[in-house]
Amino acid sequence: MTDTDVRAPGSTFVERSVEAAGFTVRYLEAGDGPAVLYLPGAGGPVMTFALDSLAERFRVIVLEYPGWGAQPNDVADFDGLAAQVADIATALRLDRFHLMGTSFGGACALHFVTHYADRVDSIVLESPAKFRESSVHPSTLAPEAFVKAFRSHPDRLPHMSSPDPAFMARVWPTVERLMGDGSDDGLVEQLVDVSTRTLILFGRDDGIINPINGRTVRRYMRNSSLQYVYDAAHDIQSDRPEAFADVVADFLARGMNFLINDQDGLINP
């Protein structure tokens, strides 16, 4: 089967916008059921088959961060971005919801839950980029190594594409300002008080955020489960869409009673 025989990832989603936090915020939405607010990586929304699968059971809302569109965002830190996300959630009439974040979005989700835990039913962190011991800055990688760090299966849809230079020039200073060096003693002190159920996922072959950082996140979050995904790099959704969607959907539906136990594990093919 060729790519032309397969529907495009995200084909079930509808693009909308909402006025919130002083911005016109673009988002994509599909599905019915309990709401899942998804915070994507630093490159903005990338639609995947995993999101399509989750939308079969949940109302999935994929945000484009304020400042990732035409309007600039001078937010100073992740706490400020989390406050903007909270305003967007309110504008979308989301009182309580599941929160899912990828890489940069995972870092934002950690800050969000320390301030708005009463709004979050559960958290899913895909390759979260908050703690980055022995990790790699993408800008230091040659093109072939860059692809390998993100994807174990770059042949699978969606294919990786080169970042748009104009987008990078506009957005990347904000990303670097918020990310810093990944350390945050203040956040650690707050995370230890968070009881929200949390699923932490790392691709075993992640070449951007070293998977050892999953243990750091788990150590700070007392009600969490850490799972390593076999045959996946940084972008788990694209490398293993079925496995990602299955384990996330089960976790969102059943919490810590989901199909994998609460010990560190490995999701096999």
Predicted regions, residues:
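Active-site nucleophile elbow and catalytic-triad environment of alpha/beta-hydrolase enzymes
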Residues: P173-Q190
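Catalytic active-site module of serine/aspartate enzymes centered on a nucleophile-bearing elbow/loop
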Residues: S224-S225, Y230-P269
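Conserved HGGG/HGGXW glycine-rich cap/lid loop of the alpha/beta-hydrolase fold
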Residues: E19-A70
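Short alpha-helix in the alpha/beta-hydrolase fold that links the catalytic acid
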Residues: T196, N210-R219
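Short beta-strand/loop motif that positions the catalytic acidic residue
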Residues: V194, I200-F202
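Acidic catalytic loop of the alpha/beta-hydrolase fold
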Residues: D205-I209, H234
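Flexible "cap/lid" loop of the alpha/beta hydrolase fold
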Residues: L110-H115, D121-R151
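Active-site loop/oxyanion-hole signature of alpha/beta-hydrolase fold enzymes
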Residues: I61-M100, D246
